Amino acid sequence: IALASGAPLFAGILTGVIGGIVVASISGSQLSVSGPAAGLTVIVFGAIASLGSYETFLLAVVLAGILQIFLGILKAGIIANYFPSSVIEGMLAAIGIILILKQIPHAVGFDSDFEGDQSFIQPNHENTFSALLSSLDMISYGAVIISILSLLIMIYWPGIKKLSAIPAAILVVILGIVLSMVFQNTALALSPEQLVTIPVVGSYNEFMALFVFPDFTQIGNKDVWTVAFTIAIVASIETLLCIEAVDKVDPYKRVSPTNRELVAQGVGNMTSGLLGGLPMTSVIVRSSVNVNSGGKTKMSAFLHGFWLLLSLLFIPFLLNKIPLASLAAILLITGYKLAKLSLFKKMWRNGRDQFIPFIVTVLAVVFTDLLKGVAFGMMIGIFYILRTNLRNSYFYKIEKNGEKNVIRIKLAQEVSFLNKAAIQQTLLKLPKESNVIIDGSDSLFIDKDVLEIIHNFKHNAFSKGTIVEILNIRDHYDVSNTKEFVLKIEKIN
């Protein structure tokens, strides 16, 4: 990700360390893992070029972190509550499909695209599907052997009860290192591009030289502030989406505090910018691997950052022997678990209003990128939510009372402006010479436009031989009634 962003390679590792140690310490999410985000690579690459230096860009990252802290204090995390469930499910399934499609080339030894890329259009000008076709012409048999053996371990090892205490993913990495060393100087040897690449530090002075610090003299540069606002908004949205998604796959169904998460991410980004790292987010792929590997608390995210730091300091040469094919096998299994056929069947059974936003999100994310795809899915999801609300603004019942129809219309708890058209059409279509009862006994709030329609209907009904009775509907409703109701529920819970 650092390479694709045009940043120093060390910046990516540093961001992962800070995401693990700093963010996990503050975050209230038990399973999310933070680090450099593939979704920000285009923004970062363009920002470094437009600002003229990496040091100036780091200042924008620091400011973005401060802005995120303010967003958390202002409780902007509440917007996560408005992400439709079908869209979040679609995002998870799409990430699973992307993992499978993107990791197949790495599994066969074709590593032209950087590890972690989730966009349909790749930096090397290929797309997800053309890269798959290209990989068929560039198969490395050493990588294929490693990935097949790794997949078999990932599938069958957890079923061996006596040995399952050792995580399959750890075994896959060890096997990959051993085989990459065995294959050296043979026809199956892996090229450097097919292995993990991290900076090797030879001394304390070399290690300290890797850190880059922000240029605070550019604090008055408006372009720096523009980049800072862009990173803060995009990173916050991506984080909130990830938090919602991780809560869905949490076996214990815990709910993460979103405002606290924004503060944690802000502190993380501020720290990352001060030390020379990249902007970070909570990352769904790393978080999903955490869940699938048996992580239960945020200690796993913290330790991931801690071990990453120790590995960088003491065994970087060993990490550089890990084949990307081994990591591809782990991510292929993660992708399969996120995009199981059973999920598609479940969403289909849930009805059209759930399945259409779900499948649109899946397709949009796969064929664009995470943020654009989710934004498109959100539009479809919100359309179906509004459509459902319009239809469910009242209960309609016709009873017989002698020769006349008695029509009872019972209004919902919340009747907003959006329900105006549906209620108006219903009232206009009522048969003449009926007795109509409009009951608002369950309503905490009725929009004034809807009240006007009801009173106008009663005023004009006499000319049509219709008798209208209005029950438990006030002349005015205050929005605070709804707030009061919500507060009461929270107190009860």
Predicted ranges, named:
Residues I1-I380, Y384, N392-S393:
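Transmembrane helical cores of multi-pass ion-transport proteins
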Residues K337-I492:
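The feature marks cytosolic C-terminal regulatory regions of anion transporters and related permeases
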